[in-house]
Regions:
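Flexible loop/hinge segments at secondary-structure junctions
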Residues: 1-254
Length: 254
């Protein structure tokens, strides 16, 4: 939860918030399995997606139309990336973990250095709704294209697609949970403790049968918490520890 979101809740009388971490996910850059495996750096992905890129000490509209124009080690394929729309939480993650993070390395962004979030709008990046299955079908039909979506859809479609390594690290449950994979993210739900049924829901959702390694949620793509972290989260739900501004700023729930 962002500080701004927490403040909105407070102003609207929603003050008994319980935050629950449910597991992990990773954003993958996927392609048709007929293509050779690819290694791409976070900076190269940034240069493919950003609306403006640094050249000769200044920002220019993104001129890259092929991956090989960014780096000769990359394939001579058109830059066509299907991804989530601006309304998507996955889009927010891409903006944060790719655009904002890499822009820290370029002084050309000035006041936006480390804050830059503008994705190009020249059809190289193609918003594809909130339907990751649609992106998978696009990759099946277009061998040159890439898709950005959650790890769970890669795990359930490995017969059709593969994912690029990011900075030499493969996307897997192990690398995502360890935060070794650069596009890993933690997943949270937030509950209004004034409604006890929401806590009952969280207790069920984080039960061993659903949320542990080998549980039902892992089978549909969620990277689970470690046994130790799961037990700690289960205890946290029982206590219904409230969220506060200090925890929000620290990115914690208890």
């Amino acid at each position: 939860m962002k500080t701004s979101e927490f403040d909105i809740c407070q102003k609207n009388g929603v003050k008994d918030i319980v935050g629950v971490m449910i597991g992990y996910d990773g954003i993958v850059l996927a392609q048709n399995k007929a293509n050779a495996p690819l290694n791409i750096t976070l900076t190269q992905l940034f240069l493919a997606l950003a609306k403006e890129v640094p050249q000769n000490g200044k920002l220019v509209p993104n001129p890259y139309t092929k991956w090989s124009e960014i780096d000769k080690s990359l394939p001579e394929r058109k830059i066509a990336v299907y991804g989530p729309p601006s309304s998507s939480g996955t889009r927010d993650t891409i903006e944060e973990l790719v655009l904002s993070k890499v822009s820290q390395n370029f002084k050309e962004y000035g006041a936006q250095q480390g804050k830059y979030k503008s994705i190009r709008q020249d059809n190289a990046y193609i918003p594809s709704g909130e339907n990751d299955n649609l992106i998978v079908s696009k990759l099946k039909a277009d061998k040159q294209a890439f898709g950005l979506f959650g790890y769970g859809f890669l795990a359930s479609n490995k017969d059709k697609i593969n994912a690029a390594n990011i900075d030499g690290v493969v996307a897997s449950e192990q690398t995502i949970a360890a935060n070794d994979y650069k596009l890993a993210r933690s997943l949270f739900i937030y509950l209004n403790a004034k409604n006890p049924q929401t806590l009952d829901f969280a207790t069920l959702y984080l039960s061993d049968d659903l949320a542990s390694g080998g549980g039902e949620l892992e089978k549909i793509g969620l990277v689970p918490l470690s046994s130790k972290d799961l037990k700690a989260m289960q205890a946290h739900i029982k206590k219904a520890n409230r969220l506060n501004s200090t925890l929000v700023k620290a990115g914690k729930v208890f």
